[in-house]
Each structure stands twice: as C-alpha cells, then as structure tokens.
Design a protein with these regions (language model features):
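Hydrophobic alpha-helical positions that pack around
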Residues: 3-121, 133-136
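Acidic, glycine-rich active-site loops and adjacent beta-strand->loop/helix elements
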Residues: 1-2, 30-31, 149-152, 198, ...
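Active-site loop ensemble at the mouth of alpha/beta enzyme cores that anchors a bound cofactor
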Residues: 44-56, 158-175
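Short acidic/glycine-rich loop or secondary-structure boundary segments that cap or lie
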Residues: 115, 153-156, 192
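Short, structural beta-strand-to-alpha-helix junction motif
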Residues: 123-128
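Ferredoxin-type iron-sulfur electron-transfer modules in oxidoreductases and energy-metabolism complexes
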Residues: 8-22, 164-268
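Short polybasic amphipathic segments
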Residues: 105-108, 143-145, 181
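Terminal amphipathic helices with adjacent charged low-complexity linkers/tails
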Residues: 1-3, 8, 24, 137-171
C-alpha cells in the first residue's frame, strides 16, 4: 500500500541522507474531509477530533502541540525537488495561456480516461478532456464541470475555454483548489450534482459552527424541492460564507450558487 511504500522510501532516505534530515514521522488520519483544513489536521495529528480552531492564534504561531507550524501540500514538496534538480527555467517553460508550470489534474466523471494527469498550468478543461482524457465517454456530450472539487463551484460547457490555474476562476465565483476536476455530461443535470455535493458537505461538516452545521442541512432541503427558493438560498449562502469559521462552510454553497448563476434553464 501507499504507507508501506512511503515507509520503504523513508528508510532508504535515512540510510543515505543527501543532507542533515529533520525528524520525519508518518501519521495516518481517519480520512475525514474536514481534516484537509490546516488547523483541523493539526487537531487530528494530536489525537483529537478533527475540528477547526478559532483564529488567531494562527498555526504559524501556535500549531501542532503548541509549536509554530508550517504546513505544505504534498504536491508542493514534490515540485521543490523537481525544480531544484531541473532548475526554475525548466518548470516555467511549461504552461499555456500565459500561465507557468505544471499541475497534477485529477479528472473524474464522464471521460474515457479518468485519473491524475500531469498537464501544463493554464490548460482549459476542453483541452484537458481531448488531449489527456481521450475525450468524453461514449454516448456522452460535455455539459459542465467542477473545476476544483466539490466546493470549487460548477461551470457550464460554454465556459470550457477558461485557463485552469490558481487565480483564473475567481471572477466566476469558482476556484481550482487541488485541481480535482469532475466532468459531467448531458446525461446529468447541474441541480442533481450540486445537491449531491451539498449532501456530502452536510455529512462531512464537523458540526462545530452553526452556519455550516445547520446551513448545509437547510440547503439540502431547499435543493430537494421541485422549485428552488432563490432569494432564501442567496440569503443562506451569504450567511454561510460570512459566518462559518473554516473553508468548508464558507465554500459549501458554491455549487448551489453556480446553478443559480450559470444553469438558470434548469430552474424553470
């Protein structure tokens, strides 16, 4: 498994270190979505329930076991090695549409070849599907996509020429996050996939703050109705965004907002 592989490679690294190494310890989490939040991850590492902390203090001041803590995404650590070995010029030589570098895009959904694809930063979803995923699955026509996982919002196929990078989607109310892209087709509808995402957030909410705990539950009920109460949904979304204490609650309404904004035909 992955853990055994990592333990084997760490043993090799310690046996022949390229430099003085810090103490390295592997900790296995229970897989809760909330533990992707920086302070909830620290709570989990400390053996406690994964719940986000109120800030300040920030984890850079008071982190794991009360010590200043620097957190990195694993992909960041991977690219540090590549850039040191191959130099920055190599990394920045990749990219499209004015963006620089490479990204690991995790593509799932209605494509022929789902999986993790290493592609240039700034590639569009249409290019990613055609060049790296061998096109849409047979019998399916591209209809829409989540550009950044369940909370990254939803965009229609007509907006499939937007470069995918860290700040290119902000103006559309979406974000790329960890580049976990979900593609759906004309066999699906945006209402259902958005409701499915909200049900996921309801299940994964840690329950610490009311806007997220109650807001996700209320949103699922509203999204299950034949006719959406758009003014109430907008009010609920604003409350969740403004008052939730961590990114889960703040971003949970993004898919719902996207349907209201980009898929109005489904609400008639």
């Amino acid at each position: 498994g992955i853990r055994e592989s990592m333990e084997s490679e760490l043993a090799k690294l310690k046996a022949n270190p390229p430099c003085e190494l810090p103490h390295i310890e592997l900790r296995r989490g229970a897989g809760a979505y909330i533990c992707g939040e920086e302070s909830a991850m620290i709570e989990s590492i400390e053996g406690k329930r994964g719940m986000p902390r109120l800030r300040p203090p920030f984890v850079a001041q008071v982190g794991v076991f009360g010590r200043p803590t620097l957190e990195h995404n694993m992909e960041t650590l991977y690219w540090i090695r590549e850039i040191i070995e191959k130099r920055g010029e190599w990394f920045t030589s990749h990219g499209r549409n004015g963006r620089k570098g490479l990204r690991s895009f995790s593509v799932s959904g209605r494509v022929k070849k789902p999986g993790v694809h290493l592609a240039p930063a700034g590639i569009t979803i249409k290019e990613l599907i055609e060049e790296y995923c061998d096109g849409m699955a047979d019998g399916h026509e591209f209809y829409g996509y989540f550009p950044g996982g369940a909370s990254g919002g939803i965009l229609p196929a007509s907006m499939g020429d937007i470069p995918l990078d860290f700040d290119t989607l902000n103006e559309y109310g979406c974000f790329i996050g960890s580049a976990a892209i979900i593609v759906f087709s004309d066999a699906d509808n945006a209402r259902d996939v958005a409701k499915n995402a909200m049900s996921f957030f309801e299940h994964e909410s840690c329950g610490k703050c009311t806007p997220c705990r109650v807001g996700t539950s209320k949103a699922v009920k509203l999204m299950s109705k034949a006719e959406w109460d758009q003014p109430l949904m907008n009010e609920l979304s604003k409350t969740m965004m403004d008052a939730s204490i961590c990114g889960l609650g703040q971003a949970a309404s993004n898919p719902m907002n996207s349907v209201l904004k980009y898929f109005p035909d489904e609400l008639k």
